[in-house]
């Protein structure tokens, strides 16, 4: 009987201990929090590491432990910064003398205030971190997205050098990759007196996490004769070339890459057509299935103009044929309403480039938030 009572006491103690156990572990430089909310795309662990009185390193992973590869952009800490850890309900707080970092153990939601409690930065309400498994050539990782709330009067500056004619990236989209005339840095400074640095080395996107779509994936296309399924492409050669005018249907305008096996030819453009001195027109109608602001990206070399709904939406732009560039613009369209579209292109070279793709409308409130996406990484890391 005595042995039974002892067994019951031990069992009760184990149950109570497991229920009352801490949801966080304090470390030498911060805290690790176990997120209680389950979900395949959710974080299981969130970590704060204090890097300075105003600098917090935030990590999150859907795995049972952190993948902690050596950062290629962060220098080692020379000294530790004093901090405290406290818990109130399911909120764990790490405090320095100038900033406080909070995380909800229930959802993993994160936010930051100054020492007086004034909000600095808040993760998307309900949780702004998602992880999607990805595997490339046997290497596993995650496509991650991190979203923060953003007031209407906020401005974002940074992201590197993109020749995009954009300065304030609030409500804008930018792809972050390295290119001949494009220098990408996943770092922004806010007019609200804080900055965010995403520690990721893969393709990233600020703003809309989706890739631009081919026109035919978003719109119904009609050629210049009204036949559905494509636009009309008309290729008029230089008179001196002796070639004939070529007319064909175009289900997309995507002439942005050289063929690997023949670097004198561009993917999807007609072969054996003399582009030097030629004039090209793509025209027809587009019909959206949604109403709203459609965001286009024009890839261009040579001389290019774009008309939509009989309006010149992109005045003539020029770029040397061997060094193309991108230009972003937006047009409001109405669901079910066909509008004319025309692209006039003078390649200005034997090998030249052209492309027009589009993003479907996004809720303006969502578009205005601070959104980061990384194609492939081991875990989420930002400062």
What annotation goes with each model-predicted range?
Residues 1-30:
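Bacterial Sec-dependent N-terminal signal peptides
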Residues 11, 40, 179-180, 228, ...:
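Generic detector of ordered secondary-structure context
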């Amino acid at each position: 009987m005595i042995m039974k009572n002892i067994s019951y006491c031990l069992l009760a103690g184990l149950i109570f201990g497991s229920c009352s156990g801490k949801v966080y572990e304090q470390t030498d430089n911060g805290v690790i929090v176990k997120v209680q909310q389950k979900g395949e795309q959710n974080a299981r662990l969130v970590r704060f590491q204090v890097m300075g009185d105003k600098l917090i390193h935030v990590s999150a992973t859907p795995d049972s432990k952190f993948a902690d590869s050596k950062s290629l952009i962060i220098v080692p800490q020379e000294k530790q910064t004093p901090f405290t850890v406290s818990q109130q309900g399911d909120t764990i707080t790490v405090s320095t003398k100038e900033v406080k970092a909070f995380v909800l153990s229930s959802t993993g939601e994160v936010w930051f205030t100054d020492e007086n409690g004034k909000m600095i930065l808040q993760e998307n309400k309900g949780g702004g971190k998602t992880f999607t498994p990805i595997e490339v050539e046997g290497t596993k990782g995650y496509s991650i997205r991190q979203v923060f709330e953003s007031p209407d009067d906020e401005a974002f500056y940074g992201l590197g050098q993109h020749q995009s004619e954009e300065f304030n990236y609030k409500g804008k989209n930018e792809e972050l990759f390295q290119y001949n005339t494009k220098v990408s840095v996943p770092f922004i400074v806010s007019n609200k007196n804080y900055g965010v640095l995403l520690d990721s080395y893969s393709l990233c996107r600020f703003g809309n996490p989706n890739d631009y779509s081919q026109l035919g994936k978003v719109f119904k296309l009609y050629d210049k004769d009204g036949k559905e399924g494509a636009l009309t492409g008309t290729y008029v050669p230089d008179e001196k070339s002796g070639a004939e005018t070529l007319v064909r249907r175009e289900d997309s305008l995507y002439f942005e890459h050289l063929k690997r096996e023949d670097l004198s030819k561009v993917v999807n453009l007609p072969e054996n057509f003399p582009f030097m001195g030629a004039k090209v027109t793509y025209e027809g109608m587009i019909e959206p299935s949604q109403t709203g602001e459609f965001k286009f990206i024009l890839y261009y070399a040579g001389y290019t103009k774009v008309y939509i709904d009989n309006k010149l939406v992109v005045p003539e732009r020029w770029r040397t044929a061997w060094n193309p560039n991108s230009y972003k613009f937006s047009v409001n369209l109405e669901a079910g309403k066909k509008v004319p579209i025309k692209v006039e292109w003078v390649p200005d070279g034997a090998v030249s480039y052209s492309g027009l793709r589009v993003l479907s409308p996004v809720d303006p409130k969502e578009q205005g938030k601070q959104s980061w996406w990384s194609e492939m990484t081991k875990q989420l890391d930002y400062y």
